[in-house]
Amino acid sequence: MIFANGRLLPDSQLSQVLEELEEAVNETRACRTLEPETVISALQAVGERLDRGELDPLILRYAGPGGRREVAHIRPLLRREALEYKLAVELGIPLYSFQERPFGRTQTVPLGTLFHVTAGNVDGLPAFSAVEGLLTGNINLVKLPSGDQGLSLAVFQLLTEQEPRLAPFLYAFQIPSRDTAALRRLADLA
């Protein structure tokens, strides 16, 4: 499966998505910004649904019996307070702001486009990796591990349904590692 612009697409559309991706990424970089508050609010809303147990069937379906425990382990990292603290510690100053320095001034801005190749040993790790990129206003291209059973795609779908402004900043692909041509095309965009 492919996740592009907030939609799940079949693998048969990979060539078409890759063909259109550079233009879509460039348009997003040129015309849109993503504020951390937008991401944090979406994560907070999805997290509240998770806390109420509304997403338990989804977790069981895509992550198996141990999935709820794994999600509970990372849930504290996705709370508003933890995300705001992470941004303050790692960025130092708010995204898009300036800080005067003795030698000039510094502005914190997104890198642009990130290409994530994540390990498959923890369910949902690709989603967590992309969340970090979203928090800093980056476009995220995620190569899903072969063992991903759909949890990351489901998380991406939930986030973009909650907050449609995230959709142009989030893409995911179930591309086999042996498809080096497709992976190279994604890497070239980052």
Q: What are the language-model segments listed below?
A:
Residues M1-T108:
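N-terminal Rossmann-like NAD(P)+-binding subdomain of aldehyde/semialdehyde dehydrogenases
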Residues L95-A190:
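Rossmann-like NAD(P) dinucleotide-binding subdomain of oxidoreductase/dehydrogenase enzymes
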